[in-house]
Design a protein with these regions (language model features):
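An alpha-helical support segment within catalytic cores of ATP-dependent transferases
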Residues: 1-13, 17, 23-28, 85-92
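All-alpha amphipathic helical-bundle segments outside canonical DNA-binding/catalytic cores
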Residues: 94-105
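Regulatory N- and C-terminal appendages and interdomain linkers associated
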Residues: 111, 115-157
Length: 157
Protein backbone atom coordinates (compact mmCIF):
# COMPACT_ATOMS: atom_id res chain seq x y z
CA UNK A 1 0.00 0.00 0.00
CA UNK A 2 2.86 2.38 -0.75
CA UNK A 3 1.45 5.76 -1.77
CA UNK A 4 1.49 6.39 -5.51
CA UNK A 5 1.91 10.14 -5.06
CA UNK A 6 3.05 12.25 -2.17
CA UNK A 7 4.04 15.78 -1.34
CA UNK A 8 7.61 16.90 -0.84
CA UNK A 9 8.91 19.02 2.00
CA UNK A 10 11.80 19.31 4.40
CA UNK A 11 11.45 16.45 6.88
CA UNK A 12 13.26 16.02 10.17
CA UNK A 13 13.44 12.21 9.88
CA UNK A 14 13.78 11.59 13.65
CA UNK A 15 10.88 13.54 15.11
CA UNK A 16 10.21 12.31 18.66
CA UNK A 17 9.82 13.56 22.22
CA UNK A 18 13.51 13.75 23.08
CA UNK A 19 14.24 15.84 20.00
CA UNK A 20 11.98 18.73 20.97
CA UNK A 21 12.23 21.48 23.58
CA UNK A 22 8.94 22.46 25.15
CA UNK A 23 8.01 25.95 26.28
CA UNK A 24 8.58 26.61 29.97
CA UNK A 25 5.06 28.01 30.28
CA UNK A 26 3.17 25.34 28.29
CA UNK A 27 4.08 21.67 27.87
CA UNK A 28 1.92 21.60 24.72
CA UNK A 29 3.99 24.27 22.95
CA UNK A 30 7.23 23.30 21.23
CA UNK A 31 9.89 26.02 21.25
CA UNK A 32 12.51 24.24 19.17
CA UNK A 33 13.34 21.01 17.39
CA UNK A 34 16.78 19.45 17.89
CA UNK A 35 18.92 16.86 16.12
CA UNK A 36 18.58 17.73 12.44
CA UNK A 37 21.41 15.56 11.08
CA UNK A 38 18.96 13.13 9.41
CA UNK A 39 16.83 15.80 7.72
CA UNK A 40 16.13 15.53 4.02
CA UNK A 41 13.53 16.35 1.38
CA UNK A 42 10.73 13.83 1.39
CA UNK A 43 7.15 12.97 2.17
CA UNK A 44 6.09 14.84 5.33
CA UNK A 45 4.01 11.83 6.35
CA UNK A 46 7.28 9.98 6.92
CA UNK A 47 7.84 12.24 9.94
CA UNK A 48 4.34 11.46 11.18
CA UNK A 49 4.94 7.72 10.69
CA UNK A 50 8.20 7.84 12.62
CA UNK A 51 6.64 9.90 15.41
CA UNK A 52 3.76 7.49 15.94
CA UNK A 53 6.15 4.52 15.71
CA UNK A 54 8.03 5.96 18.69
CA UNK A 55 4.69 6.73 20.40
CA UNK A 56 4.39 4.11 23.15
CA UNK A 57 0.88 3.67 24.53
CA UNK A 58 -0.40 2.08 27.74
CA UNK A 59 -1.80 -0.84 25.71
CA UNK A 60 1.58 -1.62 24.07
CA UNK A 61 3.78 -4.55 25.15
CA UNK A 62 5.76 -3.72 28.32
CA UNK A 63 9.10 -4.15 26.61
CA UNK A 64 8.17 -1.55 24.00
CA UNK A 65 7.10 0.95 26.66
CA UNK A 66 10.40 0.32 28.45
CA UNK A 67 12.38 0.84 25.23
CA UNK A 68 10.64 4.12 24.45
CA UNK A 69 10.53 5.62 27.89
CA UNK A 70 8.50 8.64 26.85
CA UNK A 71 5.52 10.17 28.62
CA UNK A 72 3.29 9.17 25.70
CA UNK A 73 2.14 6.07 27.58
CA UNK A 74 0.98 8.08 30.59
CA UNK A 75 -2.65 8.93 31.17
CA UNK A 76 -3.73 12.14 29.49
CA UNK A 77 -1.62 11.72 26.38
CA UNK A 78 -3.31 11.22 23.04
CA UNK A 79 -3.31 7.84 21.35
CA UNK A 80 -1.53 7.32 18.03
CA UNK A 81 -4.83 7.72 16.19
CA UNK A 82 -5.56 10.92 18.08
CA UNK A 83 -2.14 12.25 17.04
CA UNK A 84 -3.01 11.44 13.42
CA UNK A 85 -6.39 13.18 13.80
CA UNK A 86 -4.65 16.28 15.18
CA UNK A 87 -2.21 16.19 12.25
CA UNK A 88 -5.11 16.01 9.79
CA UNK A 89 -6.86 18.90 11.51
CA UNK A 90 -3.72 21.08 11.54
CA UNK A 91 -2.77 20.37 7.91
CA UNK A 92 -6.27 20.12 6.45
CA UNK A 93 -5.12 16.98 4.65
CA UNK A 94 -6.29 13.40 5.17
CA UNK A 95 -3.63 10.85 6.09
CA UNK A 96 -4.08 8.04 3.60
CA UNK A 97 -2.01 4.87 3.76
CA UNK A 98 -1.49 5.32 7.51
CA UNK A 99 -0.34 1.73 8.04
CA UNK A 100 2.38 2.18 5.40
CA UNK A 101 3.83 5.22 7.18
CA UNK A 102 3.58 3.62 10.63
CA UNK A 103 5.25 0.39 9.52
CA UNK A 104 7.96 2.31 7.68
CA UNK A 105 8.63 4.22 10.92
CA UNK A 106 8.83 0.96 12.88
CA UNK A 107 11.23 -0.51 10.32
CA UNK A 108 13.43 2.60 10.39
CA UNK A 109 13.62 2.49 14.19
CA UNK A 110 14.41 -1.25 14.06
CA UNK A 111 17.36 -0.51 11.77
CA UNK A 112 18.59 2.24 14.11
CA UNK A 113 18.43 0.03 17.21
CA UNK A 114 20.19 -2.80 15.35
CA UNK A 115 23.03 -0.43 14.51
CA UNK A 116 23.33 0.59 18.16
CA UNK A 117 23.13 -3.04 19.32
CA UNK A 118 25.86 -4.03 16.85
CA UNK A 119 28.19 -1.40 18.30
CA UNK A 120 27.33 -2.60 21.83
CA UNK A 121 27.91 -6.27 20.92
CA UNK A 122 31.36 -5.40 19.49
CA UNK A 123 32.34 -3.45 22.61
CA UNK A 124 32.33 -0.12 20.78
CA UNK A 125 29.89 1.25 23.34
CA UNK A 126 29.39 -0.06 26.86
CA UNK A 127 26.10 1.43 28.01
CA UNK A 128 24.14 -1.46 29.54
CA UNK A 129 20.83 -0.04 28.34
CA UNK A 130 21.82 -1.21 24.84
CA UNK A 131 22.17 -4.90 25.72
CA UNK A 132 18.58 -5.81 24.80
CA UNK A 133 18.18 -3.70 21.69
CA UNK A 134 18.29 -6.80 19.49
CA UNK A 135 15.05 -7.88 21.19
CA UNK A 136 13.55 -4.44 20.64
CA UNK A 137 14.28 -4.67 16.90
CA UNK A 138 12.50 -8.03 16.80
CA UNK A 139 9.49 -6.63 18.65
CA UNK A 140 9.29 -3.65 16.31
CA UNK A 141 9.20 -6.01 13.34
CA UNK A 142 6.45 -8.09 14.99
CA UNK A 143 4.42 -4.96 15.64
CA UNK A 144 4.86 -3.93 12.00
CA UNK A 145 3.74 -7.36 10.82
CA UNK A 146 0.66 -7.22 13.07
CA UNK A 147 -0.12 -3.74 11.79
CA UNK A 148 0.01 -4.95 8.19
CA UNK A 149 -2.06 -8.05 8.93
CA UNK A 150 -4.72 -6.14 10.87
CA UNK A 151 -4.52 -2.95 8.78
CA UNK A 152 -4.38 -0.70 11.83
CA UNK A 153 -1.87 0.99 14.14
CA UNK A 154 -3.40 0.32 17.57
CA UNK A 155 -4.66 -2.68 19.54
CA UNK A 156 -2.39 -5.06 17.67
CA UNK A 157 -1.95 -7.70 20.38
Amino acid sequence: NQPKQYKHSLIHNDYKYDNVVFSSDSWTKINSILDWEMCTIGDPLMDLGTSIAYWAMASDPKVLKAAFDYPTSLEGNPSRLEVVEMYEKQTGEPVNNLVFYYVFGLFKIAVIVQQIYYRYSKGLTTNEKFKNLNKIAEILCKIGWQSIQKNRIENLF
